[in-house]
């Protein structure tokens, strides 16, 4: 079809959307009157109310994600131990297998400054967790559009990420990029 395929697509898109209500994730994708722009986020008004000031007397990291290798949590915990910042970290999430769970448990065993409440499904409890910490850490090796970043920023908490996923910043303020080594 070659260059005709673009023309055919354009005609079909105009034909179909002229008689339909279009739902898009960004206003750049569809600007007509018969469309709606929605947010793919789980944020609602509760996330934007009753802000609590962070307690800055002690560094309190928060990790909210699956506890899987691609999320970089194992490497981050090794760095966390070596850095010996006198900080705390709470890890909210679950593993996808018993093997990974055992590996994770052996890694945090005996570490008094690591809190592992597990998976939290309650929105109120999750908001409370963000409020009790002062930095969200997202050590992932790869990410698309992580909603935990929006959650942390909604609760006015900065986010620490690594160079691998610097593309997620997208003009947002409050996201800080670090190298993955302590030197």
What are these regions (language model features)?
Residues 141:
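Aromatic "clamp/platform" in nucleotide-sugar-dependent glycosyltransferases that forms part
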Residues 2-51:
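A short, active-site helix/loop in glycosyltransferases that binds the activated sugar's phosphate group
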Residues 64, 88-102, 116-120:
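Glycosyltransferase donor-sugar binding loop
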